[in-house]
């Protein structure tokens, strides 16, 4: 093996032990990046099912087959693998310029990309190469819609977890401790962040096997590790033989996103030293702030900083201080319990349609989209902040309706949060912010300035942001040639300092070369264009002449007596030769030196001025980003409100000091159902939960779960500061929203449906108070009827005593006879026709409704009359007597014609009380009763409409046939308007 492959595979071995199994190593060979693989070598990666990893290593079966990384990458990028012989290296690659294109694809699939570049030296001999960049899913500055975070967890020996969330893209970090017993609370926080890598730190004294399984179980509970037993997980090859100090895993989580897990057994002992902690963190954050921070938090933070530094030291420079908390739960938030965000479909499942966030997201900027998601997943209880958010939406709604504002400025603003972070890194290191990024920043500032100008007289904005932003724009325009930022780097600086003098010298030498070229061209070819003075990347300044004319020029120069007149051919470009001479070469050297001076001056000035501007205006950046995000979210809320006819919630104050949660809504709708289910009308409901809870009964499929979700989703919207899907909505904010809507077994914990129900019920009982909202669907349906009814009755009693707002759905009608406390009973109406067909009316009506209906629903789904009758027979045996209330309401037939049912009024839709003859009996004296009582002469009506008919206020014209159905035509006698109904 020659030197380059040997260097490549030695580096690969080193990087594998440092960065884990997910390494993809790209080496620059000329103008290409290549990935190599040695054939017939054992893979360092192994793969196991989730179930295999969770058992002891001694009883694990054989590992699963692992596809070599080069094959995975080739398939991912749709490229070919080549080999020059049977035992030759397997190779694949792509042009250097396309690295950025492929990088995001590789990072998205959980790969860590190592880039080995050729070094630029003036030495002859073999080219030198070295690692230039390390990109990992959470340690990169590539553009992406969501900020990637790395989660760092320190397992202390006293069962306290130190948690750090860190984003390299914008420098944001959060640290907080959590006890092992409260670990489930962390799930509520993590859902707001896009975690791509997890780093676990533990003391070397803990039992490794027990710790590893503890980590698996913790991450499964946080939805950061596959919960399916058959899920495939790639792991380091050493995991079977022993437990080393470092373990690495790559896998897809339950949301089908690729994650990397790194486990370090044994931490740096210096991290425990308080002097080291103080010195290191104050050096990074330019501040001393470690006195009141939990020790476990500091170790977790030091760990993640070391993790980031190992991949890119620049990413930990110029950081803002972390947000430090003593608890994972904020008292100012509405806490979503029992994973309410999933049960209420706040987020879309990966690869599937739906999700409330997708429905209401009309943000134009990446910053706004992130803030909208954060607000939706972290509703608040603060009255003043909520009213401010409602007011912002109201203002934008007015501006949109008046057509004096749109989102044109916001659409042109780039992700300033990420761009400012890149600027901060460059201001504190030797790296240079690309002019392209500066151009994005500058133009984003211009559009932000226009946005501020448009809104200054309409909405309250931070007073200093506008003036400071204008000042910064002027500074950028004074220093940089903003129209040339996307062009040649030499042109990005305005002619300031010594630059005009250098430009003048360069222009003089260029003019001299041009003059020589024109003189020679004029003498030899009698024109001024045959020979041109040009700059070439490789040859520098030289002359260009067509190949046909070169011979004549050489002949002329040989016959002249001018010294230093020999022509030197440097190369060829197409049909032209590049030539020089000793005299031209001398001037070319001077020009090249000048160009180098200009480049150095421009680069230094560019870097220095950007650094100066950053530290002069850095305090503007966060308020500016927050303002743009806030305006974008408010505009999105206004667009949503107009598009879907949402209303502003009305926050009401409590009559007493006890601020009990409260809802009163008119025509409340489910935002998702009314937009996604277009085949039928979305039924709205009136809801009031001020003094009594609600118990809802209904047939399966009538909409109980939809009703519960509609309440939960609209409460979250209101407490996130957005408009709601209703005609009116009064609210006193809640502190807890506890849902129990999705049921089923928990295979991971080995719990059946009833055990899962009781676990969720335990949460409900613990958190039930006057500021809790409980939404439960068929609680206690997983056990036998008597126990289920008793537990449900006890639950209702507890909730009433705790003054808790609740809406519970159930099929257990017996509970009504057990409860003496004040509860509102409702049912969702269903109409059963004579032929057993069901019509889901879905209207919320008072009372528990019919108590037995399962067989009727079954008969509607299973078209088997014999089976249906058999089920009815057994139900009668169980009831011991013919059930007087065992069936759904059947509308009675008319005494005039058994085919006409007295169901609903054909004029107004209210319940019908009678059947009216369209043509009265007096007109049919000569006709038989059969023609008088034909269906075409009969119409069911309510008592009110019947009275209006006989008072001649309504005239019925008769039934008419349309292409699809029969239609009753009628008119008010004082109107000519057709008021036909089906």
Curated annotation (Swiss-Prot):
Pfam families: HNH, MutS_III, MutS_V. It comes from Sarcophyton glaucum (Toadstool umbrella leather coral). It is found in: Mitochondrion. GO terms for biological process: mismatch repair. InterPro entries: DNA_mismatch_repair_MutS/MSH (IPR017261), DNA_mismatch_repair_MutS_C (IPR000432), DNA_mismatch_repair_MutS_core (IPR007696), DNA_mismatch_repair_MutS_N (IPR016151), DNA_mismatch_repair_MutS_sf (IPR036187), HNH (IPR002711), HNH_nuc (IPR003615), MutS (IPR045076). ATP binds at residues 698-705. This is Mitochondrial DNA mismatch repair protein mutS homolog. One of its GO terms (molecular function) is ATP-dependent DNA damage sensor activity. Residues 905-951 form the HNH domain. SMART domains: HNHc, MUTSac, MUTSd. May be involved in DNA-mismatch repair.
């Amino acid at each position: 093996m020659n030197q380059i492959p040997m260097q490549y595979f030695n580096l690969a071995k080193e990087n594998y032990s440092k960065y884990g199994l997910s390494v993809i190593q790209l080496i620059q060979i000329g103008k290409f990046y290549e990935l190599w693989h040695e054939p017939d070598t054992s893979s360092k990666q192994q793969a196991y099912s989730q179930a295999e990893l969770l058992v002891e290593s001694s009883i694990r079966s054989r590992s699963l087959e692992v596809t070599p990384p080069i094959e995975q990458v080739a398939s991912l990028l749709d490229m070919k693998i080549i080999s020059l012989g049977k035992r030759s290296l397997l190779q694949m690659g792509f042009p250097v310029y396309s690295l950025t294109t492929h990088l995001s694809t590789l990072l998205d699939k959980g790969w860590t990309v190592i880039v080995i570049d050729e070094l630029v030296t003036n030495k002859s001999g073999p080219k030198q190469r070295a690692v230039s960049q390390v990109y990992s899913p959470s340690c990169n500055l590539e553009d992406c819609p969501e900020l990637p975070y790395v989660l760092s967890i320190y397992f202390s020996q006293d069962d306290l977890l130190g948690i750090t969330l860190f984003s390299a893209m914008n420098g944001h970090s959060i640290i907080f401790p959590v006890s092992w017993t409260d670990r489930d609370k962390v799930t509520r926080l993590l859902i707001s962040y896009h975690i791509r890598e997890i780093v676990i730190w533990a003391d070397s004294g803990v039992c490794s096997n027990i710790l590893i399984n503890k980590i698996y179980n913790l991450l499964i509970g946080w939805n950061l590790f596959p919960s399916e037993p058959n899920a495939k997980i790639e792991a380091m090859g050493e995991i079977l033989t022993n437990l080393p100090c470092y373990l690495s895993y790559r896998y897809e989580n339950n949301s089908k996103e690729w994650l990397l897990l790194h486990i370090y057994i044994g931490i740096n002992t210096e991290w425990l030293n308080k002097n080291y902690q103080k010195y290191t963190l104050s050096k990074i954050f330019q501040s001393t702030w470690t006195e009141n921070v939990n020790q476990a938090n500091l170790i977790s933070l030091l760990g993640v900083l070391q993790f980031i530094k190992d991949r890119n030291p620049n990413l930990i420079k110029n950081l803002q201080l972390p947000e430090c908390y003593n608890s994972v739960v904020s008292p100012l938030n509405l806490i979503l319990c029992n994973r309410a965000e999933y049960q209420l479909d706040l987020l879309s499942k990966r690869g599937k349609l739906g999700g409330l966030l997708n429905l209401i997201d009309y943000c134009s900027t990446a910053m706004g989209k992130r803030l909208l998601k954060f607000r939706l997943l972290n509703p608040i209880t603060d009255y003043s902040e909520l009213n401010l958010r409602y007011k912002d939406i109201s203002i934008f709604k007015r501006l949109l309706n008046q057509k004096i504002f749109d989102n044109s400025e916001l659409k042109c603003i780039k992700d300033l949060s990420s761009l400012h972070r890149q600027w901060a890194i460059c201001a504190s290191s030797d790296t240079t912010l690309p002019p392209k990024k500066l151009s994005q920043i500058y133009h984003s500032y211009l559009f932000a300035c226009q946005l501020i100008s448009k809104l200054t007289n309409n909405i309250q904005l931070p007073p200093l942001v506008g003036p400071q932003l204008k000042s910064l724009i002027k500074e950028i325009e004074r220093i940089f040639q903003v129209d040339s930022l996307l062009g040649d780097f030499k042109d990005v600086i305005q002619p300031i300092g010594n630059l005009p003098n250098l430009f003048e010298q360069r222009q003089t030498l260029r003019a001299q070369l041009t003059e020589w070229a024109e003189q020679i061209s004029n003498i030899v070819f009698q024109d001024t264009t045959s020979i041109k003075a040009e700059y070439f990347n490789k040859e520098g300044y030289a002359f260009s002449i067509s190949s046909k004319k070169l011979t004549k020029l050489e002949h002329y120069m040989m016959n002249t007596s001018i010294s230093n007149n020999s022509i030197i051919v440097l190369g060829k470009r197409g049909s032209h030769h590049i030539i020089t001479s000793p005299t031209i070469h001398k001037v070319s050297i001077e020009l090249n030196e000048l160009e180098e001076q200009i480049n150095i001056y421009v680069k230094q000035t560019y870097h220095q001025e950007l650094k100066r501007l950053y530290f002069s205006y850095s305090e503007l950046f966060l308020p500016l980003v927050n303002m743009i995000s806030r305006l974008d979210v408010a505009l999105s809320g206004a667009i949503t409100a107009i598009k879907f006819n949402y209303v502003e919630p009305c926050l009401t104050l409590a009559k007493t000091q006890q601020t009990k949660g409260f809802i009163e809504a008119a025509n409340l709708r489910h935002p998702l159902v009314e937009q996604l289910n277009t085949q039928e009308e979305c039924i709205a409901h009136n809801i009031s939960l001020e003094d009594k809870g609600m118990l809802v009964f209904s047939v399966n499929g009538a909409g109980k779960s939809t009703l519960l979700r509609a309440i939960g989703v609209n409460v979250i919207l209101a407490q996130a500061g957005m408009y709601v899907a209703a005609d009116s909505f009064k609210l006193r904010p809640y502190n807890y929203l506890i849902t129990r809507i999705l049921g089923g077994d928990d295979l991971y914990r080995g719990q059946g449906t009833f055990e899962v129900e009781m676990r969720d019920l335990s949460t409900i009982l613990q958190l039930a108070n006057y500021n809790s909202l409980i939404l439960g669907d068929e609680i206690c349906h997983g056990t036998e009827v008597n126990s289920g009814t008793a537990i449900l009755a006890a639950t209702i009693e507890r909730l009433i005593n705790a003054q808790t707002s609740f809406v519970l759905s159930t099929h257990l009608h017996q509970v009504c006879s057990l409860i003496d406390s004040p509860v509102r009973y409702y049912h969702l109406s269903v109409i059963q026709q004579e032929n057993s067909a069901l019509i889901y009316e879905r209207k919320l009506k008072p009372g528990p409704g019919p108590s037995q209906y399962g067989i009727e629903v079954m008969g509607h789904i299973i078209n088997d009359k014999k089976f249906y009758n058999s089920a009815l027979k057994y139900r009668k045996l169980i009831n011991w007597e013919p059930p007087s209330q065992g069936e759904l309401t059947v509308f009675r037939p008319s005494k005039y014609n058994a085919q006409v049912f007295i169901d609903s009024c054909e004029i107004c839709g209210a319940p019908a009380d009678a059947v009216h003859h369209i043509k009265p009996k007096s007109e049919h004296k000569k006709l038989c009763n059969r023609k008088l009582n034909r269906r075409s002469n009969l119409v069911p009506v309510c008592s009110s409409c019947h009275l209006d008919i006989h008072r001649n206020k309504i005239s019925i014209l008769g039934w008419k046939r349309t292409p699809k159905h029969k239609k009753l035509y009628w008119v008010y006698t004082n109107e000519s308007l057709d008021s036909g109904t089906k």
